[in-house]
């Protein structure tokens, strides 16, 4: 914690001053003070962006998106149907707010389930490079406050991720699960759909979660089991 505080003083998250601001394809947009953006940025109608924000090169922000203050949006990012609150970092290559993967089998064809929800990313959170977050179908997909996602994570439609969570790279969530607060998930774990995972849960890397998990539990393995049981059976 001390190292984090010290390095933040010497290496602050600053807004780069050498961005080309001659972007042509910006529609009617509500910008506040000190918004800087790179080359080939496209911003749709009725987008709202708070003060002290940075938008990287080749990024697309589609109509009606809301971005709070002190946010950093990386390069090659696509954002649609999303509300981003304050002090949020979206790293390079993320796609946020696209339609989820939901279909009705109907005779010889699959009919896509409607997705009329949005994505909400709350204050002080970070979404790692190359991650994808699908918008909700009939409800919203939500990322809690002070939650950090590593690179190449997939969050499917309708998931609710709590506050103060840390999720390592290549974790995948199926749809409509709820994650409590202070949850830690190791890399390449998979979370099945329609589950309830409690507060203060630890999920080991590579685990497959197919059942609900109660508060203050540590699990590992496939299917994920109580950590003590897993270690006892895998010595």
Predicted regions and their residues:
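Phosphate-bearing ligand-interacting subdomains
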Residues: 1-18
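Structural signal for interior beta-strand "rungs" in well-ordered beta-sheet cores
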Residues: 25-26, 30-226
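Long, leucine- and charge-enriched amphipathic alpha-helices
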Residues: 225, 229-235
């Amino acid at each position: 914690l001390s190292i984090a505080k010290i390095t933040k003083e010497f290496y602050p998250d600053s807004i780069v001053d050498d961005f080309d601001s001659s972007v042509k394809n910006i529609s009617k947009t509500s910008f506040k003070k000190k918004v800087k953006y790179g080359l080939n940025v496209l911003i749709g109608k009725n987008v709202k962006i708070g003060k002290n924000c940075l938008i990287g090169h080749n990024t697309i922000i589609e109509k009606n998106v809301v971005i709070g203050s002190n946010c950093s949006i990386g390069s090659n990012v696509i954002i649609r149907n999303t509300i981003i609150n304050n002090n949020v970092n979206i790293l390079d290559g993320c796609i946020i707010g696209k339609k989820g993967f939901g279909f009705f089998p109907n005779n010889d064809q699959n009919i896509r389930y409607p997705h009329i929800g949005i994505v909400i990313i709350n204050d002080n959170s970070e979404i790692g490079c190359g991650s994808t977050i699908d918008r909700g179908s009939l409800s919203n997909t939500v990322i809690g406050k002070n939650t950090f996602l590593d690179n190449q994570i997939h969050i499917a439609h309708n998931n609710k991720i709590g506050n103060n969570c840390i999720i390592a790279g290549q974790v995948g969530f199926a749809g409509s699960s709820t994650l409590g607060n202070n949850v830690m998930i190791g890399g390449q774990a998979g979370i099945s759909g329609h589950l309830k995972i409690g507060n203060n849960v630890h999920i080991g890397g590579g685990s497959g979660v197919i059942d609900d998990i109660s508060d203050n539990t540590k699990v590992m393995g496939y299917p994920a089991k109580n950590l003590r049981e897993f270690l006892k059976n895998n010595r």
